[in-house]
């Protein structure tokens, strides 16, 4: 019998099945996070690196559960006979790796509070300290447990209090520390929202709008971070300096033409990192509360059969819970969605001309070269060129796609800015990330600071499309005006031709009269 009950007995078939199901779910979740970290190089940041290391611990835990559940305990008795302080070798391994996983969760929470509350941009220097804290402290606890068992002659019965204290005390401290971090993060975001209101001159920091009149310049607020909706009026009198690179827009941008002012609308929205912390706290407490309840009922000599069965199912789900809470975020979903679109378009044969027409790419229109900006909203985000077999058909249709490879088009914002002349007034605001980063074109998934990265709510593509619609409407109006002017010119030309014909008829000389 193990002092910490992780693995059911050989005769417990139902409990073994439940452990197998839950540990398999955790194994799938861990493999998903590990694969994502290896495949997407742009996501290999410090925060995900910590999650990657914690996921390795959870992966090992899932493997131990699966192996120990389907192998009889007599095969581990040889190790127990040589090292009696192990009591049960698989349970001792699980004890160590669970402690290591708890401490890595503490390190992740510490990183969040350092970045968000204290604006510490050197948290990557703490990686070695995190390794020593997580793995070293876990090993120290296990060594102390083995020392107590060896020299105090304590048996391996489940009623022994020392293993329980050395496991559940770190567990409870981890949960309490994450509660404190969640409370501090919530308080910090509220303070930042209030300070944002005061910096813009909003009374009490709780107002909804700030107006920039014609005499004001947005450069006066060049160091703020806009975490709300920004409504920019299309007014050329407002001064937006191209050197303003420090305004960061994290949500939408809308365009109005009501008055001569810029309106910043403040929307109160709880950041996703807060919801992630809350979800982690509830799931962590729910998973381990059953195990704590089993220990309490055992000390009270009460029946724990059904509660122990629930505990066997939920304890191996610890890795799956970590994968869902920490691994699945907005940036990951955005990259997965983009990859799915790429493979979907590639393998369903969207290289042909007819399929491209269905996505708004018209190859028969000769004026398509000059109307790329007007058709930007109708395009798919990823354009593909035809394969080698379709080259002749595309040449006959005057199509611009003649390569044999597919490629990703530039950012939609760059297309809009090149083909829309009225976008220059706001390009400095929307393109601030591009100006601050010299590694390539604008990327909605890229963040200029670790603090901004934690929001994971960049929705600037919708803003760009709104601006594109406004500019496209202006271009359409200009085209209509030009067409009207051309029609008027044609009418005038027809009138002139009629007048000339009349003049010619009056100037004709009859030959009979001359004779």
From Swiss-Prot:
Name by which UniProt lists this protein: Cyclic AMP receptor-like protein G
Major location (coarse): membrane
Residue intervals passing through the bilayer: 17-37, 51-71, 93-113, 130-150, 165-185, 277-297, 307-327
One GO term (biological process): cell surface receptor signaling pathway
Keywords, ordered alphabetically: G-protein coupled receptor, Membrane, Receptor, Transducer, Transmembrane, Transmembrane helix
GO MF term (any one): G protein-coupled receptor activity
Segments of this protein annotated with the region Disordered: 362-409, 469-515
Subcellular location: Membrane
Family membership: Belongs to the G-protein coupled receptor 5 family.
Residues in the Extracellular compartment per record: 1-16, 72-92, 151-164, 298-306
GO cellular component assignments: plasma membrane
